[in-house]
Amino acid sequence: VYTKGKKAFINGRIEICAKLNAAKGAWPAIWMLPEKAAWPSGGEIDIMERLNNDSIAYQTVQAHYTYTLGITENPKSHSTGPIYPDRYNVYAVEMYPDSLSFYINDMHTFTYPRIQTKEEGQYPFNQPFYLLIDMQLGGSWVGAVVPEDLPVEMEVDWVHFYQRKSKK
């Protein structure tokens, strides 16, 4: 799924209900990129990444501040949360003008806030982002694919977006 040029999201909660089948070398991901800005300065919102047979999912933000400058702990830019490996799980991010809050199965995993800093590019997330749902096979983070584990799928049940009403 690739919504660039079709649907972009800002100021709301996006939820994806998906079952992540396991295989060595499988790297399913649900993530977002800015509609009109370049990476990494425009940011990246990783709503879910799972590696191989893990029983956790990774949630991360990337930006010039976290990726290029390597500042990942002030504020913390990543977390993990437990998943049910053989069931559907709900992955979510709430997008606010001054923070991103991440959830797995309605359990809050972490919040990435806008902070005061002299460094550039700390919070580029107050802009429209498009959604990507994909399955990569192999890579530096997951290692080589084991052919005997294939085929492998990510089954998506639904995607919901809840737009916050603007204050008048």
Annotated model-derived regions:
Residues V1-K168:
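GH16 jelly-roll
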